Amino acid sequence: MALVAGSAAYQVLRGVTGTFPTQSATLLARAPALCARTLNRRRMSSRRQTDHLERTANTFRQEIISPAKVCEITNESATVKRVRLAIANREFTFKAGQWVDFFIPGVPKVGGFSICSCPGLLETEGVLELAVKYNLHPPAHWIHSQCTLGSEVAVRVGGEFCFDPQPSDLPLDLVLIAGGVGINPLFSILLHVADLHKTHEMTGRGFQMGNVKLYYCAKNTGELLFKRNILDLVKSFPGKITCSFHVTQQSSPVCVELQPFITEGRITEKDLASYVSTDQLCYICGPPPMIESTCKQLESLHVPKEQILFEKWW
């Protein structure tokens, strides 16, 4: 289950003014509209809370709560179900990287799940997707044990961790770093990046997206969510979208198709150093310890703190 706790201190909200470090001035001048919230790094190690609404009480939410109906359920992995929801309210929108409050009739607890589909899918088909890992928390347990085609729920968008460039913004390169089911919001961003590339290639208009690299770590290849979709994007946008998969407990042979993209072991500073530069924006999502170590690695590579955005899941 992917739940929001915050992002790093990168303040590029539309309409927000402030003083930024000189070393980031050039990037800030070219930065697109990003959603982010200042977060004291000490909160990274704060005690775990179990309630999504408590954790996100001070986080932005839209006013619209839309009815939704489950229209497709698939097994993304042995432990993760991918759920497609048909959204009833046509005014309902979201930005790549955001999440939803998930309301289930008869279940008192409200779920909080990152959206793994892109805004374009909602615009064209009226649906969004969630990928939910099994656990005993009531909303996640309901999805794995009781949710069926036609089940009715309600959703509300929230979150300040997103990528929403405007057509007039200058090109920008991204680094996406995911751990486990922390891939969800980053996959949404990656799909949105692909849509931006398609739009610019077909029309010559809109935001001109730079290059993106995804680093994604999971226990084994079976737990690498969306891996086929990700490889399809890499093939469709050679050089513009690249990826590096990392596995920490792989016990079976890796299939031939995945082998060129697989590295055994966690994502290290050396891995990041081969690609990361000081003029990129870095998005991180995963367990708090993974975020803490990755932030330190990026700072060691001289990436300004203002260019490191993160979101925790629990």
From Swiss-Prot:
CDD domains for the chain: FNR_like
Keyword tags: NAD, Oxidoreductase, Signal
Pfam assignment, any one: NAD_binding_1
Domain FAD-binding FR-type intervals: 63-166
Keyword Nucleus: no
Signal peptide: 1-18
Top EC category: oxidoreductase
SUPFAM superfamilies: Ferredoxin reductase-like, C-terminal NADP-linked domain, Riboflavin synthase domain-like
EC identifiers of the protein: 1.-.-.-
InterPro entries in alphabetical order: FAD-bd_FR_type, FNR_nucleotide-bd, Oxidoreductase_NAD-binding, OxRdtase_FAD/NAD-bd, Riboflavin_synthase-like_b-brl
Entry binding sites for NAD(+): G180, V181, G182, I183, N184, P185
Keyword Lipid biosynthesis part of the UniProt annotation: no
GO terms, molecular function: oxidoreductase activity
Protein name stated in the entry: Oxidoreductase NAD-binding domain-containing protein 1
Organism: Xenopus tropicalis
Lineage: Eukaryota, Metazoa, Chordata, Craniata, Vertebrata
